[in-house]
Design a protein with these regions (language model features):
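N-terminal interaction/assembly modules
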Residues: 1-133, 137-151
Length: 151
């Protein structure tokens, strides 16, 4: 799988976990282990992907990190989503923002910040509303400037 496809699966897992706190991360990840991202299973409506061990480790790291640092990530989102409360942000955008901010904050050695932002914007275009792209890009660009200013 490409890194973009892995990011997309990561987003889908986080989005699913937003609504299903009753299932474990491991069970959620297991649902994604066997199929192809271009096809969907009508019954479960989940993309089916073939994940390598490296892909699973990457996804597990991001998902665990987002869950463990959710309060901190939400604080960052609240700071840079001017005029928006977390409750008003659609769940697609919120999941994308949490995922990307985690990657920017904790994994910038592995992924350049601009790449993280671009990938997040592409995912928001695909799964969000027509305004998602601009909203996600605005929040992440503001956070990017703050990170660059701190260095």
């Amino acid at each position: 799988m490409t890194r973009r496809e892995v990011r997309e699966v990561t987003f889908m897992m986080l989005f699913q976990l937003e609504f299903r706190q009753d299932i474990s991360i491991e069970d959620t990840l297991a649902q994604y282990y066997t199929i192809d991202i271009e096809s969907t299973d009508e019954e479960e409506n989940l993309p089916k992907v073939k994940l390598s061990e490296s892909d699973r480790n990457y996804i597990q790291t991001i998902v665990d990190g987002v869950i463990k640092n959710k309060s901190e990530l939400d604080g960052i989102i609240s700071l840079y989503a001017k005029g928006w409360t977390l409750e008003r942000i659609i769940k697609v955008d919120l999941s994308v923002l949490r995922y990307c901010i985690y990657e920017m904050k904790y994994m910038s050695e592995e992924t350049p910040l601009a790449v993280s932002i671009n990938e997040a914007v592409e995912i928001s275009k695909k799964y969000g509303t027509e305004k998602s792209k601009s909203f996600v890009n605005g929040v992440l660009s503001s956070y990017y400037k703050a990170l660059k200013g701190a260095n």
